[in-house]
């Protein structure tokens, strides 16, 4: 199952978060359609900007759009003209006030979406697919936070009559481990032989203490009773022993005194009442 499913959807709520964050009842379908239109608008108008992901948050009268890009200068434009144009297009599309945030991706070689887009651009420029895949893998494995990568190309590779899929992998990519931080990207290259799909999986280590694990740990801690402090036993005393009628006399002061007094052969040891008197 982990080999086929989208890694982001497979780990939602465990190690990954939703890219659209809002609540709706009757307008749910309209909001989903609107989110798809927003992402499509940004993808078609900013192909060369290197957009890694788009996050959308909604309030009652405002929409916040966060664009994570490797080239923020292209998105902002000269004196912010491009950003103003994008904001105007989004406000026209949504009919609400739009807050546009442009965030720079610090390490584009470790972002799966940007790696897939880079391989697809090379395929469109008639670069050999094996060379493009190996070059992307070498660049990604140089990053300190990348533990493994897998790149797959599907389509009429090299102009072959029959389409096929080929992939290269380096390092470790545990797709079925839920705590694994797997970044996934998909992009399509438009070539003269048709479209070639490029998929990239990047493994960045394990996330210990995900959302569900932390929540479960909090619930278990709330259920358990608080530990009571243990009292120190005075030196030279014996632990109490339970008898048929409660505590024996050896656990009391009188019992200890009677135990320490040596008894004669013909006389029995004095009882607790005799010692007290």
From Swiss-Prot:
Residue pairs linked by disulfide bridges in the UniProt entry: none
Show the InterPro entries listed in the entry.
KH_dom, KH_dom-like_a/b, KH_dom_type_2, KH_sf_prok-type, Ribosomal_S3_C_sf, Ribosomal_uS3_bac-typ, Ribosomal_uS3_C, Ribosomal_uS3_CS
Domain KH type-2 per the UniProt entry, residue ranges: 38-106
Checking Pfam families in the record gives:
KH_2, Ribosomal_S3_C
Q: How does it assemble?
A: Part of the 30S ribosomal subunit. Forms a tight complex with proteins S10 and S14.
User: Might you name a Gene Ontology BP term for this protein?
Assistant: translation
Q: Where is this region: Disordered?
A: 217-277
Recorded GO molecular functions are: mRNA binding; rRNA binding; structural constituent of ribosome
Annotated NCBIfam families:
rpsC_bact
Report the gene name. Answer: rpsC
- Cellular component per GO, a single term: cytosolic small ribosomal subunit
Q: What is this protein called?
A: Small ribosomal subunit protein uS3
CDD domains for the chain: KH-II_30S_S3
**Which family would the database say this protein is a member of?**
Belongs to the universal ribosomal protein uS3 family.
Q: What is the annotated role of this protein in its UniProt record? A: Binds the lower part of the 30S subunit head. Binds mRNA in the 70S ribosome, positioning it for translation.
List, as start-end ranges, the regions of compositional bias called Basic and acidic residues. Answer: 225-235
PROSITE patterns (alphabetical): KH_TYPE_2, RIBOSOMAL_S3
Annotated Low complexity bias: 242-261
Keywords (alphabetical) are:
Ribonucleoprotein, Ribosomal protein, RNA-binding, rRNA-binding
